[in-house]
Amino acid sequence: MECKRARAYSSSANLGSGFDILSIAHTAFFDTVEICVENKNLNNIIVESNSKIPLEPNKNSATYPIVKIMEEIGIKASLKVRVIKGIPEGLGLGSSGASAAAAVMAFNNLFNLNLSKEDLVRYAMYGEIASSGSPHPDNVAASVFGGVVSVVSVSPVKVVEIPINYSFDILLFTPLNVHIEEKTKKAREMVPKTVTLSDYINNSRYISSLLLGFIKGERELIRLGLNDKIVEKARLPLFPYYPKIKEVAIKYDAIGACVSGAGPSILVLTDKMTDENKIVEEGTKTCNEFNVECKVIKAKIAGGVGIEGRD
């Protein structure tokens, strides 16, 4: 029985004003997906997992992309798919996107399809449909490519890897006792359909500043860029502790802070100028004031999805 196993890292989407556009892959957590071919004369998928995820292929973020690849390319096979979840679900850390990215990578390698990275993203987006009903590309793009990415088009899929010329670390405040049913779907429904011209202009300035800051290696541009006037404000009821954690982060000279994806996790970028210990101490105290138990994870930028066991 031939098997392939792939690993994809967690990610934080949006990075302030880059809703559905920007995302960063980080080493905080990872998911692993193993796919084995049991019979090439049958056509079914059996799902196993260490987590309570849907076992029906069309409702599973790892296997629905595989179903779509098999349909489009015309592959017939009986598969056993084992999804090993390492990324906590519902915390805005790209859990479903990483599973989808790992699955399409393992399947691509198993059947020697030679799909491009952008094709992997296109298929992995079906995993987001299975998870939340929306094919948002930002998390899957980060998990596939690694680093910081910008999704500049979804039809066709076009992803640009952003050069990072400033060294930074990552702190993630991850709430342990916050559970929001169908969180991603609910959070997307909170995003306003129309915005004021002034908010649009400010957000355009922020995203420009962030990208230029990464490319030019300018700390103050990155700090300015990690702001948002639209989506974070609309979703604030989901993470009321965020403004104060951001205030603490800036007080102790973090580069900046933003909500990780749809939340409730908070992403803080730090460097040698930052007092990380104070941010962790006071940020955790802030969480407690809101009756939220936060675990703080330190991470770095992660690479893209890869096959495990390859020399």
Swiss-Prot record:
Binding-site list for ATP: 88-98
Domain of life: Archaea
EC assignment: 2.7.1.39
GO biological process, one term: threonine biosynthetic process
Keyword terms, alphabetized: Amino-acid biosynthesis, ATP-binding, Cytoplasm, Kinase, Nucleotide-binding, Threonine biosynthesis, Transferase
Catalytic reactions of this protein: L-homoserine + ATP = O-phospho-L-homoserine + ADP + H(+)
Keyword flag Isomerase: no
Principal subcellular localisation of the protein: cytoplasm
GO MF, any single term: homoserine kinase activity
Entry's localization field: Cytoplasm
Coiled-coil blocks: none
GO cellular component, as recorded: cytoplasm
Pathway where it operates: Amino-acid biosynthesis; L-threonine biosynthesis; L-threonine from L-aspartate: step 4/5
Primary role: Catalyzes the ATP-dependent phosphorylation of L-homoserine to L-homoserine phosphate.
Family statement drawn from the similarity comment of this UniProt entry: Belongs to the GHMP kinase family. Homoserine kinase subfamily.
PANTHER family: HOMOSERINE KINASE (PTHR20861:SF1), HOMOSERINE/4-DIPHOSPHOCYTIDYL-2-C-METHYL-D-ERYTHRITOL KINASE (PTHR20861)
Protein name: Homoserine kinase
